[in-house]
Amino acid sequence: MGIVLKRAIAAGMKPFPNSTWHWSRTIRPFSQHLSSTCFLQQSSRFTSKRYLHLSTLTQQEKRFLPESELAKYKEYYQGLKSTVNEIPESVASKSPSLRTLHKRLQLPNELTYSTLSRCLTCPSAKLPDKINNPTKGAAFVNTVPTNKYLDNHGLNIMGKNLLSYHVTKSIIQKYPRLPTVVLNAAVNAYISEAVLAHIAKYWGIEVETTSVLSRYLKMEPFEFTLGRLKFFNNSLNSKDGIELITGKNFSETSALAMSVRSIIAAIWAVTEQKDSQAVYRFIDDHIMSRKLDITKMFQFEQPTRELAMLCRREGLEKPVSKLVAESGRLSKSPVFIVHVFSGEETLGEGYGSSLKEAKARAATDALMKWYCYEPLAQQEPVIDPGTVVV
C-alpha cells in the first residue's frame, strides 16, 4: 500500500482527492494486490448503489411467478369464481361434503345439492368494494366474490321465523303458564346463535380456511369449496391467543347459525306443498330433542307476596304457611319444614335453617308447581291470563 501511495504522489496526484472517481481509477490497476475487503471499502459510492440496485432487482425477479404459471392461476381463480357464483348442480353433486351432509341429516330428495351449497354461503362472503378491491391491493386471498342472489340471506330470515314460531309454540303447549320472561329465555336457550352454531358443528359443517392460492397449488376441485361454509372471516388470519372482535354477521358463530337456519328454510321450501309438517319434524328431531330444565330459569324476589297475588287472581283462599316439623331449634344447625296451604289444599313445601327461609322455599315450590304445570294430551288447551303483577 505504501508503494502505491508513493507512486501516486510522484505522479502529482493527491492521496485523498475530492473526486471519488479519481481515487478509484488510481487504485484500480493495483487492486489485484489488495484484499477484497479493502477494495470494497474504497470503491465508489455509485458503484455500491448500482450493485445493490441490481441485486434487489434480481431478488424481485426471483419472487415473481412465471407468466405461464400466473396464467394458470388466473384461469383457476376465474373457474372457481364462476362455480361459486352459479353453483351448478352437476358440480355440487360431486362434493363429498355436501353428499355426506345431505345423507347425515336425511334431507328430502327434493332439496338439491346446489341449494344445500347455497345454505353454506353467507352474504358477508361478498365483501364491500372498499375492502375488497384487487386493483388497489386490498383483496383478501381467501375470499372469492359471490353472487348476492345465491347466498343464504333470504333463507336465513325465513328459517329464523320458522324456528321462532315452532319453538315458541312447542314450549307454550308444554308449559302454558310460563311467564313471558321465562318463555323468552327458554326460546333463546333453544335457538340462540351459540346453540345453533354448536348444532352446525355437530352436523359436521366445515369452514373454508384455506386460501385460493393453496387450493390452486393442490389443484383442489371446485366442488370442495362448494361443500364448505364461506363467510367474511375466511379471509382473516387467526393467531393463537388473539380473538378479533368484528360485526356479528362476520363471526364464525353467526355464520354457522345462519347455515342451520338456511337449511331449515330450504326444507320448508321444498316440502311445503307435499308435506307441510316435514320441517317441524326436522326441528323436533334436531332442536327440540335437547333437554332443557325449565325450573333453572326462575328467580323469585318476593315469592310469598307473588303467591298471595296469584291466589287472589285465581279465586283461591289466601295462602297460609304452617310449621309441620322441626329439629334442633336451639342447636347450631336447626331444620324447619314448612307447608303452605290454601284452605285445606297443600300448595307447596319447603325447608330451611330458619322459619323465614323455609317459608320462602315453600312459596317458591308452590309457584314452580303452578308455572311448570304440564297438561295432559286429553285435556283442553290451557289459556293463562298472564304474568302475575307483584
Swiss-Prot record:
Query: One Pfam family this chain carries?
Result: Ribonuclease_3
* CDD domains, per the entry: DSRM_MRPL3_like
Instruction: Give start and end of each DRBM domain.
Output: 302-372
What's an example Gene Ontology biological process for this entry? Answer: mitochondrial translation
RNase III domain segment(s): 139-205
Which GO terms of the cellular component aspect does the record hold?
Answer: mitochondrial inner membrane; mitochondrial large ribosomal subunit; mitochondrion
**SUPFAM superfamilies membership:** dsRNA-binding domain-like, RNase III domain-like
GO MF annotations in UniProt: double-stranded RNA binding; ribonuclease III activity; structural constituent of ribosome
Q: Where is the transit peptide?
A: 1-59
Which PROSITE patterns does its entry note?
Answer: DS_RBD, RNASE_3_2
The answer to keyword Membrane applying to this record is no
Listed A to Z, the keywords are: Mitochondrion, Ribonucleoprotein, Ribosomal protein, RNA-binding, Transit peptide
- Ribosomal protein found in the keyword field: yes
Q: Which family does it belong to?
A: Belongs to the ribonuclease III family. Mitochondrion-specific ribosomal protein mL44 subfamily.
Instruction: Indicate the quaternary assembly.
Output: Component of the mitochondrial large ribosomal subunit (mt-LSU). Mature yeast 74S mitochondrial ribosomes consist of a small (37S) and a large (54S) subunit. The 37S small subunit contains a 15S ribosomal RNA (15S mt-rRNA) and 34 different proteins. The 54S large subunit contains a 21S rRNA (21S mt-rRNA) and 46 different proteins. mL44 forms a heterodimer with mL57 and stabilizes rRNA expansion segments 1/2 at a membrane-facing protuberance close to the point of attachment of the ribosome to the translocon in the membrane.
Functional note: Component of the mitochondrial ribosome (mitoribosome), a dedicated translation machinery responsible for the synthesis of mitochondrial genome-encoded proteins, including at least some of the essential transmembrane subunits of the mitochondrial respiratory chain. The mitoribosomes are attached to the mitochondrial inner membrane and translation products are cotranslationally integrated into the membrane.
What is the name of this protein?
Answer: Large ribosomal subunit protein mL44
